[in-house]
């Protein structure tokens, strides 16, 4: 099984590292082209394009400027330890054992606007470039056109390497849109997490994001390799609801805490 998750806007380059092992991203030639485009933008243009504050725009203009083609532990850190959003709060990779990192390296992929596809131990220099941003480039009007089939092809390589054909889609719609399902050599399983609110079950973004991380951790810790094993997920009060599930979609619910 290959697990797909989104990156995070919040980054952590300060906390102590729990592993010294690292690999290098496999699509850096493409990243270099995007950096070339991004460096043309002024901070006010970045602010408008990304809908972020002037302060954040300044930080990200500096990141684009400082980005170097040579990645080292001094200027970068492993992607799975650098991202710090809600998904990664659930994942808690900072508590992984070396064996957990090994399994994750084979079975987990992070989709990225700048790096395309990241393995957990791939070094990553800090950046902000969300997949949905309309950054014009030599290949088209946005990042979806830039990446084209490249991300899908890289995922197919990972699937072939592990010898199976199941993708667990725990990424957001914005990021999964960079994947071409018809060209993906896999059955796609999408876990959906519903929380009860005033007696009704619905997707609550913050909880759903964290649950995607919890599910990723559940798969990694238990070395799961078959999609039917996912129905045993019960972290933090979630339970599998077979009646609400359908082909390709596994629904998990959690009652409101009273």
Swiss-Prot record:
Regions crossing the membrane: none
Cellular component terms per the entry's GO annotation: cytosol
One protein family per Pfam: H2O2_YaaD
Signal peptide extent: none
GO-annotated biological processes: response to hydroperoxide
Family recorded in the similarity comment: Belongs to the UPF0246 family.
Protein name: UPF0246 protein YaaA
